[in-house]
Curated annotation (Swiss-Prot):
GO BP field: potassium ion transmembrane transport
GO molecular function, one term: ATP hydrolysis activity
UniProt-recorded name of the protein: Potassium-transporting ATPase ATP-binding subunit
Organism in which the protein naturally occurs: Halobacterium salinarum (strain ATCC 700922 / JCM 11081 / NRC-1) (Halobacterium halobium)
Enzyme class, broadest EC rank: translocase
Residues reported in the UniProt entry to bind ATP: 355, 359, 416-423, 435
Length: 719
């Protein structure tokens, strides 16, 4: 499935601005104590602008008006960050809604009629909105499935590309784990009877849309904890600044010419000291993290799941579909007995030229790579249209052999059968070539080299699959097949290990195959001959050690483990039980996607931590700017702290508030995009965080505040 696209147009930009003002409602802002206090400060500034002498102030109306406007902009910019992020979330929900298709359904009048005997007299064509839950509909070739349901009779090839993005159709049939169908998908062949399982407005897509919208609104546990921390800091600063007011009154009683501290300037100091930057961006960071997950076509049921992905200690991976493609491809040819390389390559090529299986196509591809391209009767390379699996095959060596494809079209291709466990070709000259499982070919052949078993066992021990090849009853060699590793999977596993996540492979394959795959990609730990039911025990064992664990699954038997795991990524192509149990659903049904999800979770936590560090460092810098400016008149010794040598106290206050307000919109793109994240250890990330965002947070205010003060001097403002 193509990535869910999100586009914010001009109208939505205007909507975000409008929402920024709507969020000024105190009943809404009280949920964010930091911004609520800033809004109260704005109100105090407005009162002092209207009545400057109310608190015994000595500043001008213009000065107080400037302070009030800057405080107001601080709140508005913070609201805009949240509103813009929320619009991105809404745009994602709209993208999912665009996948919904209005369709008509053939509502059966009699559910008992045999599917092969259904005619137009047996059903009524009605709108999908009129079909009730538990009703049975008939879906013929070329029809759109009107509603989500379960196949109760028949089997059909279904195009689910609108939902999954997979162009390859899937088989849906009654019985087993492949009975679930989704409304809006198309039946390409055959016919099925479907029992509707959802009410109107409760389809799979409706649920996904609801999950996206709900997840955007819900605060995550870490965000709640951060809000509590910021609230505590805000309370401390409110008490400290309020105490300073009375301290100023005390100083005024014996310091000549000092009339006390200006309330508006104290409000400015309070706002500058509070963690307004991270308080303003917290919601935007959360929503943006959810947005990045959804853009990967993963639906997270809550922000908790995304955060948990960033905190994972262990990741359980399936072999097939996650680490390997699930396809076996030819890796080498091994001659036996009196045969040589050329004999084995030629026989393997001829027996596989019309074999449409992945293994057959990869054998042709490997033979051609070892000997150069071969021209068929039609003048086209026999492997020209091979699929991706064959493309990854590398020739182990060069073999001089004539691969004559001419005349093979007149030969008789023998397809694979479960009974013989072999396939092959009968050439027009009477030659019989067979390839297949070693024991099957061994039983078929009349001449078997003594090293057949030894060589086949060696291939099996290396994680491969041996196919024996025989010509006229004589075994001439072995074709070595290997599970095809997903491109770049070793690098991705190494990357996730750098994040401090332990990788564990659980597979039903034998020990030899499991060990070979684990060694190839660098898995930390593997479990072979593993039943899906055992996964929940593995999850519980890891959690008993105090670790967070993630896994993927698609079957009903995966559901308990998916529900138990801290991060359970269910495949959209899987069963309803799996999708309900997991806290994430991958619309692309790509198990290796969980590695990306872990990276997104890490980036979310990294972004929040980095901007928190930057915000706190900002506050420290602003403290050294404002405190000497406000108290220098009463305590001249504080002038030594004025390291920027700002022109006037009014200029210092105004420049600081300008920086405090405008740094928020400047950081919105970073909050939405996320900080650049590379897989590193926790110690390396902490060091980088402190240097880049801690150091940057200390230096940036000094640079910008001094620049603004110099601009004021040049313009003659506050002089």
């Amino acid at each position: 499935m193509a990535e869910i696209t999100v586009t914010i147009d001009t109208d939505q930009q205007k909507q975000a601005i409008s929402d920024s003002f709507a969020k000024l409602d105190p009943q809404y802002l009280v949920k964010n104590p930091v911004l609520f206090v800033v809004e109260l400060g704005t109100i105090i500034g407005l009162v002092m602008t209207i009545a400057p002498g109310l608190f015994g102030a000595t500043g001008s109306r213009v000065y107080y008006a400037v302070i009030t406007v800057l405080l107001g902009f601080t709140v508005i910019f913070a609201n805009y960050a949240e509103a813009y992020a929320e619009l991105e979330g809404e745009a994602q929900a709209d993208s999912l809604r665009a996948l919904q298709t209005e369709a008509e359904g053939k509502l059966l009048q009699n559910d008992d009629v045999d599917i092969e005997d259904i005619s137009e007299d047996d059903y009524e064509v009605v709108a999908s909105t009129e079909i009730e839950q538990d009703a049975v509909v008939f879906v013929d070739e070329g029809d759109i499935i009107p509603r989500d349901g379960t196949v109760v009779e028949g089997s059909a090839s279904v195009d689910e590309s609108a939902i999954t993005g997979e162009s390859e159709p899937v088989i849906r049939q009654s019985g087993g784990d492949r009975t679930s169908v989704v409304g809006g998908t198309e039946v390409l062949s055959d016919r099925i009877k479907v029992e509707v399982t959802s009410e109107e407005g409760e389809s799979f897509l409706d649920q996904m849309i609801g999950l996206v919208e709900d997840a955007q609104r819900q605060k995550t546990p870490n965000e709640i904890a951060m809000t509590i921390l910021l609230s505590g800091l805000t309370l401390v600063f409110v008490v400290a600044v309020a105490t300073m007011f009375f301290f100023g009154e005390y100083l005024a009683s014996f310091v000549g010419g000092f009339a006390g501290l200006d309330v508006a300037e104290l409000v400015a100091l309070l706002v500058a000291l509070m963690p307004t930057t991270i308080g303003a961006l917290l919601a935007a960071i959360r929503v943006a993290g959810m947005t990045r997950v959804t853009r990967r076509n993963v639906i997270a049921k809550s922000g908790r799941a995304v955060e948990a992905a960033g905190d994972l200690d262990a990741l359980i991976l399936d072999k097939t579909g996650t680490i390997t493609t699930g396809e076996r491809v030819a890796q080498d040819f091994h001659p036996l007995g009196d045969a040589d390389d050329a004999d084995v390559v030629r026989a393997s090529y001829q027996s596989s030229l019309y074999d449409e299986t992945t293994e057959g196509r990869s054998i042709v591809k490997l033979a051609e790579k070892m000997n150069g391209k071969v021209q068929t009767d039609g003048g086209q390379s026999a492997s020209e249209e091979l699929d991706e699996p064959g493309d990854s095959v590398d020739a182990p060596r060069d073999v001089s052999v004539t691969l004559d494809a001419e005349g093979l079209s007149e030969s008789n291709f023998v397809p694979f059968s479960a009974e013989t466990r072999m396939s092959g070709i009968d050439l027009s000259d009477g030659t019989e070539i067979r390839k297949g499982a070693v024991d099957a070919v061994e039983e078929y052949a009349t001449t078997v080299p003594g090293k057949l078993r030894q060589k086949s066992n060696a291939i099996s021990e290396s994680g491969g699959t041996p196919l024996a090849i025989a010509v006229d009853g004589q075994v001439v060699g072995i074709i070595e097949l290997q599970d095809e590793l997903k491109p770049g999977i070793a690098d991705r596993i190494a990357e996730i290990q750098k994040m401090g996540v332990e990788t564990i492979m659980a597979t039903g394959d034998n020990q030899r195959t499991a060990r070979w795959v684990a060694d190839q990609v660098g898995i930390d730990e593997f479990h072979a001959e593993f039943d899906p039911e055992e996964k929940i025990e593995l999850v519980e064992d890891i959690q008993d050690d105090g670790k967070l664990v993630g896994m993927t699954g698609d079957g009903t038997n995966d559901a308990p483990a998916l529900a138990k795991a801290d991060v359970g990524l269910a495949m959209n192509a899987g069963t309803n039980a799996a999708k309900e149990a997991g806290n994430m659903v991958d619309l692309d049904s790509n198990p290796s996607k969980i590695i990306e999800v872990v990276g997104i979770g890490k980036q979310l936590l990294m972004t929040r931590g980095s901007l928190t560090t930057f915000s706190v460092a900002n506050d420290v810098a602003k403290y050294f700017v404002l405190l000497p400016a406000i108290l220098a008149a009463a305590i001249p010794g504080l002038g030594a702290m004025d390291i920027l040598n700002l022109s006037t106290p009014a200029s210092a206050v105004t420049a600081t508030l300008m920086y405090n307000a405008f740094i928020i919109p400047l950081l919105i793109p970073l909050a939405l995009r996320g900080v650049d994240y590379k897989a590193q250890s926790g110690a390396q990330l902490l060091r980088k965080n402190l240097i880049v965002y801690g150091g940057g947070g200390l230096i940036a205010p000094f640079i910008f505040i001094k620049a603004i003060d110099m601009l004021f001097v040049a313009l003659g403002v506050f002089q």
